[in-house]
Amino acid sequence: MELIQITEEEFDNFAENYEIKNFYQTRSYGALMDRHSFDDYYLAMKDESGNYKAATLILIKKELLGYKWGYCPRGYLIDFNDFNLLETFTKLLTQFLNQRNFMFVKIDPYIIYKSRDKKGNVIPGIDNSKIVDELIHIGYEHTGFNLNFENLKPRWNAVTTTNSTEDLFSRFSKEIRNKIRKADKMGIEILEGDASSVKQFYSLVDKKHSRKLNYYLDMMEILGKKDMIKLYFAKLDTAKYIEKSKTLFEAEEKRNNEINQELEENINSNNTTNIIKRKMASDILLNNCKQNVINATNLYKEYPSGVIVGASAVIKYNKEIFFLIDGYKQEFKRYCPNHYLKYQIMNFYRKEGYTRMHLNGISGEDRKSVV
């Protein structure tokens, strides 16, 4: 076996045909990070017949006195269950890096440690604890089961698969389902952006991360060449908001009148308690509908063409989507734009045949007892 440096094209050819591939081990991601404080190496291990058996992108950070450290994002591209192959690759990689003044290299492999439910409890399914044990055995230092976002990539990720629109919707909590319905009633619609939309997108997400505008401009330029990134916006269509608000008001007004009629017809009855309760509930709902009509009318006067209220960036690769970052205008929070945005994006890609949806990193604070 021999470890060699390969071209970006050779690496991409290997990565594209590798079974367990991921977005972070691509030429495109390497090119992006090359513009943002890292250098990039593309390495492969080949056998005596010249066949590549493993490969990795290494991002390189230079330190003082010529020393460096490396990071293999979600790497390597290797069969982690083949311990002999893994050990050989590690030895060759160590030799390669030592010759080039590397102090260390970090890895966070794209493997699931154990299957867990949404509360973090271990459930029957995947168990890759033997891989972790083997990595430690051959010289890797395990930095621990972090709970938050201490590492370069989050440990905890919310991932879902779905078979139908109904199945997808049912997977959300009752609270989120209600917010999605609310956004729909208030005239939120989804628009797709392009390279010219990046500045508008950035204005909605700049407070959520330290990345600057240039990072997203570069991302759209580099990943856009391979159709790996999409920008989506949530727009409050104020004309539609008025229309829907009036429709809901008229429907509730009709229902309220019917309850009034029912109450008049049963005024001398001893069985009016339930009718009165329904009347009180309808009065509250009718008043809310009226306020929505007033609010929609005022918004239409201010934004006759509608207003962008939320945005989300999505990475698409290998029939998976990754929600990279999202944001919304705080003053329009009550319209639940990002809940609706995420749901509609997920439903769109489900119909396009995408099988896994990564909802981005989550904290493990509520899972301290199950690390």
Language-model-derived ranges and their functions:
Residues 63-68, 80, 112-117, 241-243, ...:
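Short catalytic/ligand-binding loop motif for oxyanion handling, primarily in non-cytosolic enzymes
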